[in-house]
Every structure is written in C-alpha cells, then in structure tokens.
Amino acid sequence: TNYAFKKLTKNLDLNKNLKKNISLNQLFISKINKPKKVWSSWNFDSDNNKHKQHLGTLHSIKKKSYISLNNFIKLKKIKKVDFIKLDVDGHELDVLKSGDKFLKNNKPIIFIEIAPYLYPEFGYKCSKLITYIKKLKYSFYTEDLKKIIDIDSYVKKITNGGSENFYLMKSYKT
C-alpha cells in the first residue's frame, strides 16, 4: 500500500548504508489477476469499509503498476535473489505463478504467510496453492526451520480466520 511504502521510504532515508543496496518499487506482482482494488492497510481506528474477516481496508491499484515477477526480474536485470517474503493476503498463487520460470530455475528461499480462509475469495483452495508450491519443487518448513513432512494435514489445523508462516526451500531427493 501507499502507506506502507511511504513508511519504508522514510525508514531507508534513516539508514543510508542500507539505502544504497535497496531499490524500492511499488508494484502489484501478478500473472493474471489485475484487480482495480485490493484489501490492505489495517486501519484499527475506523470501522468503515473493512474486510469482514481480516479487517483490511479497500485501496485502489494504479493502472500501470502491474507486472509479473518474471518480467520484473528481467526488466531490472536481476541476476540473483536469495530470499522472497510473500505476504499478499490471498494473491499468493497468482504471485508465484507470475514467477514460475524464475522460481523453477533459481529456488530462492521464500517466507510465505498461508491463510486458508482467504483463498476461496480468490477462486482457489489452499490445497491448490500447496500443490503448486510442490510442483515448483519446494519443501515446507516451520518458522523454527523444522521440515514439515505432511503439509496438507498441517494446514488443515490452521483455525478459520487464522494464518501461519512457513519457509519454502528447495526440495532435495534422498
């Protein structure tokens, strides 16, 4: 959101050593979906126009701010990505699909928030997201880096309206 982006910009201005290594880009990473508005910016001071479950507020997306992850990496001539933080409130599957070529070939570590209650709103189930992540040859790990053997059973234990963070790392066959 614009609010979060302004805060990040201000923070970087205070950290000159970090600023020279970081390029800020306010974009909507997507392969297919191009919504005109998205739920974000949790405003705890107002009850107006909040999402019924996660309480985000609706914000407009600029028309020219859409790009796929594959195209962004190509456009910016990015050679190496070590880590991706993915917390996009239901758009996870679309973001991952938008970077399919890059993710299949490079396997950066991904820190992802999985919130099963959100996905039906976007036309898919959590099982579809998990299947796609496995297809990309990633394994699931807890926040304390313990490998999850049966992710399908694990996510079924996430309470309705809840979410959990996971690390995704390259799968190795033994």
Language model features by range: what are they?
Residues 1-174:
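Phosphate/nucleotide-binding beta-alpha loop and adjacent structural elements of enzyme active sites
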